[in-house]
Amino acid sequence: PPSGGKQLSKEEIEIIGNWIASGSSPAQSVAELKLDENLKSYFFMTKTNFFPDVKILAVDFEKIKELKSQKIFVSPINKSSNFLSVSTINKKDFNDKDIDKLLEIKDNIVTIDFSKSSITDSIFLRLSEFPNLTVLRLTDTKVRGEGIEKLSVLENLKRINLVNTEFDTAFLKSLTQFKSLEKIYLF
């Protein structure tokens, strides 16, 4: 295992093996690795009863294909669910207006990773329209926190990651209004 760390999981070892087999390019995106669906779901691991307990229709595959062509990674959270995880990690220029591309599938999205994107506080109003959003990652963005209270209407939001943001501590109190929030990552 890494010094002072935990042993890599079987999935992590397999992902690294795929990366090495495909040429080990540090610029290669997750989407370019062409991982098996079981390995893709590793990036969006779930625990029982973590996500909303509602039945939801599947999203048209053509819509997912369209988003992927725009470097927006979309994947089911597992094989038996119509819920989706969305990541813009490969689209650094994803901005506040680009969220409109996700509105058509907003009911299916439970996890969004906007890390290292170009979003700002303006995103909070639109995100408040995603009823099943459970995990929100805003790591390494320009988010300051103004308007974050708009997310308090999201009854399923359990985790927010605000690591390496410009989050202003004046907005911390707003987070106490969130009924389901279990964890906030902020440093």
Briefly describe each language-model feature range:
Residues 1-66, 70, 84:
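Aromatic- and Gly/Pro-enriched helix-to-coil junctions and flexible linker segments
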Residues 27-28, 75, 183:
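A local structural micro-motif
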Residues 71-77:
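Short secondary-structure junctions
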